């Protein structure tokens, strides 16, 4: 099936069942730091950078980005090429999906090759053209694509990995490192392998995709030393005249995101990865998003450090010194001040120890870091016999000798979480089937075994997760644990009594049987975030779930099929406490969703409660949002003479109104009062909304 999508009507025509308003609520954050292919197309130049596409228009200087929250069908672009005959950019994705993008933003999705069931490797290596037809060189042969409508015309299984193709003198040539050069007359049956003639030799394709001349405009397009797009003209003497200093869309330095943090109105992320099964070896990166621009921390070199600078795994912020940040990594503990590198703590200059027998500094595993309120930094130094350590605010180190952490084994300890209710630091051991949950009283150096490797649920059934990933707390004092067996939690009673008791929340089937199912049982759950409405955002290996406050209702299940989520493998989710944004760190990058919940206020006043948009103009048909409310506030919207037009309860500190009355009809022009009552019964008018029709 082919879907034609224009920028103007994209929110109406879909590949999926995305709602108009829901689509608007997504943002995809793509990196554009590494330009790999440049495709001039007249006055517009398309660029592939860090597996994402952007364009630059020479007539007005407009920079346009393209992503899955906009017109694109997928993420992870591997190749682009401009089809002159059809005036479309062929966009090939790493999963073999294909988009055809025009200069004005129209997109034809051609998913047939991507959807084709086959045991063959469908990797596309190169794109070549013969009129309106694109020949896609694949790992098994050649695919012929009509670039006018996205139809797959033919598939030629040559039984070899084709590096590139070209048409010459009535023949289609396929160059293969394995079998040499293959050719077939275009007038012959190319589906018949016997018509393909093998020639000796293989010619390596020599093309510089980042230094390209546009045959039409005679302009040269290239990238600057710092990775930006630029173009220039050559005069008769070969002198270059540059037309721009360099173009690069706003974006993070890479698409590597693993853990997310909110601090002082900014979003921070570390981009490393490590587990017993996955050794990321990803560059040491800290991304910073201030809501408008991206920046990143200084990256020390291996020469500076004497070891690799890879796989940043966690971070925390000094409560006593603004801008002072500590980052835990696979290769030690990194100190930064205002984004500048200060020092790396490793086995040479601290009690941190290497996890390997040869004492390699590349594996001084700092897998959890957390400041306590007094400014002491607690560090989990994984895969050694004394993994819990503390760097005092005076600069002195201490090693905590807790018998539960030293007996008979080493530990893959991670995810330090400071509970606001209990004052303990919670962390997990995720050492395959030997998982453990710990609560540490850091004030008195007491470690409590909170369960594992087996746990007992409320029905006295035994649970033995293969992994534990993450710990957090909800607004009712429940300690939630993300595990390979699904989400588990300890009630305040479970926390007090210990003994490995957990709750697997039971969701009623509501089918008259009084039966219930465990919430996301055996769904690999990697992270749980609690928003202002006490709802649970659950990151899994099959997308993101939003679960209601009482955990009985699945409000959303976002996947790559029904949302702009870049990947169904979601490592982390962050509900920003300073806004209604929810951020998702996935296997293929970062995105965010504008939810309908914000952090509630303890007290509602006319100074901290407001509505937007306000006034509501005639052309606006979306939701009107009231923010600054208290938790679970009873909200009524009334006319100036007291007639009720809408009512409900806040989600966290927010309430959404569609601008309609109780009968579903848009309200008349006028001033509407927002009356709110807290759970204890205190009430009053907290703000006013002007509606203009």
In which residue ranges do the predicted regions lie?
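Carboxylate-rich, polar loop motifs that coordinate divalent cations or form catalytic acidic clusters
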Residues: 20-609, 644
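Terminal processing/anchoring signals of secreted or surface-associated proteins
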Residues: 19, 597-602, 611-614, 642, ...
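Glycine-centered tight-turn motifs at strand-turn-strand junctions
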Residues: 644-667, 678-682
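C-terminal tail/sorting-segment detector
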Residues: 673-693
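Bacterial Sec-dependent N-terminal signal peptides
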Residues: 1-24, 171, 376-378, 693
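Glycine-centered coil/turn sites that cap beta-strands in beta-rich domains
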Residues: 603-636, 654-657
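Short, conserved beta-strand segments of beta-strand-rich sandwich/propeller modules, principally
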Residues: 581, 668-673
């Amino acid at each position: 099936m082919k879907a034609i999508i224009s920028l103007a009507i994209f929110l109406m025509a879909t590949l999926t069942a995305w709602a108009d308003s829901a689509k608007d609520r997504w943002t995809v954050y793509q990196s554009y730091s590494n330009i790999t292919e440049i495709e001039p197309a007249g006055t517009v130049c398309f660029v592939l950078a860090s597996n994402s596409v952007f364009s630059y228009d020479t007539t007005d200087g407009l920079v346009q980005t393209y992503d899955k929250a906009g017109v694109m069908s997928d993420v992870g672009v591997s190749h682009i090429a401009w089809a002159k005959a059809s005036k479309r950019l062929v966009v090939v994705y790493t999963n073999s999906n294909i988009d055809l993008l025009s200069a004005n933003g129209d997109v034809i999705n051609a998913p047939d090759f991507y959807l084709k069931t086959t045991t063959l490797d469908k990797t596309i290596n190169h794109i070549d053209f013969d009129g309106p037809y694109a020949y896609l060189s694949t790992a098994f042969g050649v695919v012929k694509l009509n670039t006018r409508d996205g139809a797959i015309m033919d598939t030629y299984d040559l039984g070899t990995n084709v590096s590139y193709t070209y048409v010459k003198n009535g023949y289609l040539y396929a160059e293969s490192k394995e079998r040499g050069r293959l050719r077939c007359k275009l007038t012959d049956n190319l589906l018949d392998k016997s018509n393909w003639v093998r020639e000796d030799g293989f010619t390596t394709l020599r093309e510089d995709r980042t230094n390209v001349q546009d045959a039409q405009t005679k302009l040269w397009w290239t990238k600057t030393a710092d990775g930006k797009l630029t173009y220039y003209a050559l005069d008769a003497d070969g002198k270059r005249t540059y037309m721009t200093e360099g173009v690069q869309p706003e974006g993070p330095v890479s698409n590597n995101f693993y853990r997310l943090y909110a601090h002082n109105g900014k979003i921070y992320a570390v981009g490393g990865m490590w587990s017993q099964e996955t050794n990321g070896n990803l560059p040491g990166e800290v991304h910073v998003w201030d809501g408008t621009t991206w920046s990143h921390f200084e990256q020390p070199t291996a020469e500076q450090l004497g070891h690799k600078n890879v796989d940043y795994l966690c971070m925390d912020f000094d409560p006593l010194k603004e801008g002072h940040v500590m980052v835990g990594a696979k290769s030690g503990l990194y100190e930064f001040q205002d984004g500048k590198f200060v020092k790396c703590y490793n086995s040479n200059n601290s009690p941190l120890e290497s996890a390997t027998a040869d004492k390699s500094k590349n594996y001084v595993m700092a897998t959890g870091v957390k400041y306590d309120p007094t400014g002491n930094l607690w560090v989990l130094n994984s895969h050694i016999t004394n993994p819990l350590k503390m760097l005092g605010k005076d600069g002195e180190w201490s090693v905590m000798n807790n018998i539960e952490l030293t007996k008979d084994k080493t530990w893959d300890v991670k995810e330090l979480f400071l509970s606001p209710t209990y004052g303990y630091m919670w962390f997990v051991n995720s050492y395959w089937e030997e998982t453990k949950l710990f609560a540490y009283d850091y004030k008195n150096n007491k470690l409590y075994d909170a369960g594992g490797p087996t746990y007992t649920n409320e029905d006295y059934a035994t649970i033995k997760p293969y992994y534990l990933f993450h710990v957090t707390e909800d607004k009712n004092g429940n300690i939630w644990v993300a595990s390979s067996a699904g989400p588990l939690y300890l009630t305040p009673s479970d926390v007090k009594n210990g003994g490995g008791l957990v709750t697997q929340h039971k969701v009623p089937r509501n089918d008259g049987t009084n039966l219930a199912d465990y919430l996301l049982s055996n769904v690999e759950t990697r992270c749980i975030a609690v928003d202002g409405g006490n709802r649970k955002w659950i990151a899994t290996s099959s997308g993101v779930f939003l679960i209601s406050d009482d955990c009985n209702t699945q409000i959303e299940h976002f996947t790559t099929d029904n949302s702009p989520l870049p990947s169904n493998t979601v490592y982390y989710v962050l509900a920003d406490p300073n806004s209604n944004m929810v951020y998702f760190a996935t296997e293929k990058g970062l995105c965010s969703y504008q939810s309908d919940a914000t952090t509630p206020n303890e007290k509602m006043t006319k100074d901290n409660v407001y509505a937007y948009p306000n006034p509501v103009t005639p052309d606006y048909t979306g939701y009107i949002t009231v923010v600054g409310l208290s938790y679970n506030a009873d909200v009524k919207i009334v006319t100036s003479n007291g007639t009720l037009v809408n009512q409900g309860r806040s989600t966290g500190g927010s309430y959404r109104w569609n601008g309609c009355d109780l009968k579903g009809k848009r309200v008349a022009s006028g001033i509407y009062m927002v009356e709110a009552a807290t759970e204890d019964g205190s009430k009053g008018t907290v703000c006013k909304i002007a509606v203009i029709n």
